[in-house]
Amino acid sequence: MELKKLEKFVDEIKEKIRRLKEQYYAGKTEVESELRKVQKELKTKVKEFFKDLTPWDRVQLARHPKRPHTKDYIERIFNNFQELHGDRFCGDDPSIVAGIGYFYGKPVAVIGHEKGRDTKERMKRNFGMPNPEGYKKANRVMKLAEKFRFPVVTFVDTPGAFPGIEAEEHNQSKAIADSIYTMAYLKVPTVSVIIGEGGSGGALALAVADRVFMLQNSVYSVISPEGCAAILWKDQKAVEKAAEALKLTAQDLLQLGVIDGIIPEPYGAAHIDPLSTARVVKYCLRKTLNELTKRDISSLLEERIQKYSSMGVFEIAPTIEKYD
């Protein structure tokens, strides 16, 4: 079953479930058995479809137009979120949303990439590709959180930092480097969740956290499969091979020790049930922040520095001399 056919099937079944629930709550308890049967059918079909996904399949799911974005998670997880604008240097970049909200009654700083939904909003938000002003804004909010001792939660969903001429003129590389440096040494607990695409340094700028989680069908890589295929194979048709070679899935990155955990997506994909996905993310954040906020900040900072300093470290095997 193709993804579009599956989504059509899911929509039809969900509508059927909605009607059966209305009847059940109206007092027609005889529909309970049929309701359970339909719900089971939905779970079985979806589970069967998503059980053997290739890395390229997961890339396509990570980019799905209906996949929940940062603003969706903010709306469903945090209370009284107040967005902050501007980098206090040049301007504001809508491709990064940043502000202060309440999580179970306690203030937290929330920062994330935002791609937008329709064409107009996507153009406004530059398709989730931040300019230097976006990273400077994120940097400002991180330092604000540190000043008032708020934990920092980030949501990563970007194909990468914007590679335009103006972005380079405004020192894109330094803006990313400053964000990475600030996040590495923040004296507050930090949690990052990769919710869609995690593209190169543009993603890393918001992902140097104490704990990094990935949604089941998100991806995180130094380059897109298309870019990798063009460079290594000189062929756009090699995207599937490139996706496999890049080890960009949550499963691969957990095994490699790059991330700390995988957040399951209900019904196999976040866009099929965004509300349930937000609930799972909320539970993960609550559990993680409860753990981190109890820790001494000096030991947490030391652990964070050690974690990222040790990535990519390797040993060269000693030379074995040959004897006649």
Model region roles, listed by residue range:
Residues P65-H69, N126-M129, A167:
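Short coil/turn segments at secondary-structure boundaries
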Residues M1-P107, L275, R279-D324:
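Intrinsically disordered, low-complexity segments enriched in small/flexible residues
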Residues V156-R286, N290, K294:
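Conserved catalytic cores of soluble enzyme domains
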Residues K51, C90-D92, A98, Y104-F155, ...:
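Glycine-rich beta-alpha loop segments
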Residues P68-T70, D118-K120, F162-G164:
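Short active-site-adjacent helix-start/loop capping segments
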